[in-house]
Amino acid sequence: MSRLRVLAANMAAVITGKAATAVVGLATVVALTRHLGPTEYGYYRTVLTYSAFAAVLADSGLYMVTLREMSQGGVDAGRVLGNALPLRLISTASVLLAAAGFAWLTPYDPPVKWGTLIGAAIYTCLQASDFIIAAFQSVLKQARNALAEVTGAVVTLAGVSALIFTHAGALPMLGAALLGAVVALVISLRLARRLVPFRMSCDLSLWRRYLIAGLPLAGSQILGMAMLRGDSLLLSLFQPAAAVGLYGVPSKLFEVTTSVPYQLAGLMMPALTMSAASDRAEFSRQLGRTLDATAVYGVAVVIAFAPFADRLLTLISGERFAAGAPALIVISFAIALAGLTHVLRFTLVACGKPRLVLFADAIACACAFAAYFGLIPRFSLLGAAAGTVVAEASALIAMTVALRRAGHSIPSLINPAKAVVAGAVAASVMKYLADFGTPWLLALAVGGALYLALVVLTRAIPRELLHVISGTVRKSGVRHG
């Protein structure tokens, strides 16, 4: 099987797994929002946002360093993973427990303060599971990770559904999320060991090397998480819990949808690492294909969320959450920008330029927080969404400049431009159909089908890649894992 086919098969596994996880996650959000309401769901989202923000402080750039180390020829991948994983667990748990203690010094309500203890356990498991993805990506076996992720999401949904009958509040629901995170971690560990046999070990010299190599990436991760979570965190400080709850659904959709291009970028990193030093033409082709696919995906998200945002939120969470529609419309554009930024960030790391990533993220973070502080106090959740667009646009521009400083340029933008035009046509058709009384779900389906047809006919995405992905999903599901 050619490398393109292997990558496409793995991307099909990623898309299938993420789609399944998204469906289950959406069902969980539906259950949570309809049961808890804006205020209690606001507590739930604030805990997860606070814990996620704290978790990244302990990241140390270990994920990208480990993936890069495991992608190099002649390296004992099991030794790399066996030493890096306990370092990740210890650093994450320590920082999260400290953050949970610090939460008691903040003006948060008691449910949030107690919830941060559960959040610390949740994100210790989630960070470990995300770290283990490096093992699956290094050998291009993504379907196994998808299995762990989907199973964890199903367990969380089952726990939430059971707790609804007891009229539980936000804290027990966080317990259900913890149960799902533990199950996903256990499955990931078992499956990863079958692909890359490893034993937990503590080689202090390796720990020191990984930490030093990861410092620029750690700074970049901290800045990136500050941009990603800063909107919700500042919203929780400047606005009541109900506003956080209303913003929580668009924010959750942002998290779910941006995970797909993040996974694609991670899949491409081994190939980009090898070609960056030896074959500039192949490097440019691989980067171009990845950006094309990411642009097509990003435009698809915009036309899926923006035209019928109020009805989509009503369908997901009920009429009480429809007030978050303007924020969802704005944030859909941030999703498209974030996907492209993920690709460029991984590309710079593959080129051995983590300091440029840190520099770019520092500039973007400064722009983001200027927007957050300027917009959130005045415009609430709409200001948070607009600030996110500023953050992602700044990051994309900064990463593009950094790539040029690394000696590479962005490949042709013809295919992304085709995707934008196709999306505009599809969105116009949706609006036309809706204006004439067509049910919005039918109009959305017609517009989506038209968009897919246009990007295929205009070759905005390579046909071979499309054929392989569709064939893999149709014929073999997760068999390639």
Language model regions located:
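Interhelical loop/hinge segments that connect adjacent transmembrane helices in multipass membrane
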Residues: M1-R3, L7, A143, A170-L171, ...
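N-terminal membrane topogenesis motif
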Residues: M1-V24, V75-G78, G82, L204-S220, ...
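Signature of the first transmembrane helix
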Residues: R3-Y63, L96, A100, G152-L157, ...
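Helix-loop junctions and terminal segments of transmembrane helices
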Residues: G25, A58-V75, S138, F254-D292, ...
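Hydrophobic transmembrane helix module of multi-pass membrane transport proteins
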Residues: S51, P86-L223, R229, K431
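Membrane-interface junctions at transmembrane-helix termini in multi-pass inner-membrane proteins
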Residues: E69-Q72, C125-A148, S332-I363
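Alpha-helical transmembrane segments of multi-pass membrane transport and lipid-handling proteins
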Residues: G82-P110, W114, A158, A162-F165, ...
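Membrane-proximal transmembrane or re-entrant/amphipathic helices at the cytosolic face
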Residues: S428-G481
